[in-house]
Amino acid sequence: MSAPSSAPALIPRRGMMLVLSSPSGAGKTTISRALLAEEDGLEMSVSVTTRAPRPGERDGEHYHFIDVARYMALTKDDGLLEHARVFENYYGTPRAPVEAALARGCDVLFDIDWQGTQQVAEKARTDLVSIFILPPSVGELERRLKGRAQDSDAVVAARMAKAMDEISHYFEYDYIIVNDDLDRSIADVRAILRAERLKRARRIGLAEFVNRMRGAGE
């Protein structure tokens, strides 16, 4: 579990939900991994799913694996910040562990699409910071997808079509990063994260800190 960030340690703050969205191949996963490796006080949101674990997946690390009855109960009780059905399986982000992390000053990283981001925004807009990662061009995105050498031409074409739909929702996000240079894009996301941590509204201990300072100066 990540420790709360210490920027600055004197003033307690509430954590934030940091959402990264992008079309497949734009670099979101690579950027997310770099953030988790480099930033203190940042942890990855772990989704629930009703599908069976795949080889190598561990409960509580990759997903929380639950049955359909438990999933439906969470949905009914508003226990999910966002949820979706993908083919025959259900996925969602449990609210309770995210709320607990925010309350102790930890930031939570989300790897979700624009639809999930909309749902989170409806339930917790003040805690949300959203970033959309764009490729530098359509041609570069297609080159990256083909460079994976793991998908057929038909699958690449389908991913490109989906990417155009996803990109059309760019205006719903707080920040836009064009990932033409990976190192710079990672630095930009880290800069956003650090600036958002300093926002007055998130620094829940600020009034007490200032009052103590004023009292000491009298």
From Swiss-Prot:
Domain of life: Bacteria
EC number, as in UniProt: 2.7.4.8
CDD domains registered for this protein in UniProt: GMPK
Any one annotated GO CC term: cytosol
Function: Essential for recycling GMP and indirectly, cGMP.
PANTHER family: GUANYLATE KINASE, GUANYLATE KINASE-RELATED
Name used for this protein in its record: Guanylate kinase
